[in-house]
Amino acid sequence: MLIILIKRALAKEIEFGIPIISVGNIIVGGSGKTPITIKLASKYENACVILRGYGRDSKGLFVVSSNGKILVDVKISGDEAMLLANSLKNATVIVSENRVKAILKAKELGCKIIFLDDGFSKYQISKFNILLRPKDEPTNIFCLPSGGYREPKGFYAQADIELLEGSDFKRVITIKKDGMQSELPSKTVLITAISKPKRLLEFLPKDIKMISFPDHYDFTNEDIKNIQEKYKDYSF
């Protein structure tokens, strides 16, 4: 935690001459950043979403999509960036470990507003900070590796806006069959590869099975074949 405090104290913010909004959290695991980023970015013209591209096979900066046109495959972008690109038909999505380079690239492409997915810890970037606070917070208040926080819990006070799950935003999940909202077959399996999959249980009928893989799991053809064979009498 001391290292985090020192980094924040020494950081000199850089102004980029473009509105930059960070949607982040300070806990380990999912908190709803991606769907909220999609919702916000969809409200603006010439928006750009920048993220690291967790789990991708590539390194460096890649423009995943430009005004909704997909430019790379999911191996290069990572699954989260591809979800953003497919969801935002009029936006640009960039992956890069170096957010500063990505911001400069977004400006070069003519973007007028930038959303940083999980950008709270980028202290050197002058930005408007939105922090999401889940309803189920870690009971251990220490930072990694001892506890469940990535930043000190007191850093919530440093957000420009703090959004509390349950009052400021809610998760609304609809399970669909064949792209249409309808009643699911009684023998259905839900396959997940997200952080904290148990949070889905409250939205599921009790007779649906759930198979959980690690967050951002890269499914192989063998995985899919094994699941289909094991649950051949089930819908997915």
What role is predicted for each listed range?
Residues 54-168:
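Phosphate/Mg2+-binding loops and adjacent switch elements
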Residues 138-233:
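C-terminal accessory "lid"/substrate-recognition subdomains
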Residues 7-68, 72, 171:
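Walker A (P-loop) phosphate-binding motif
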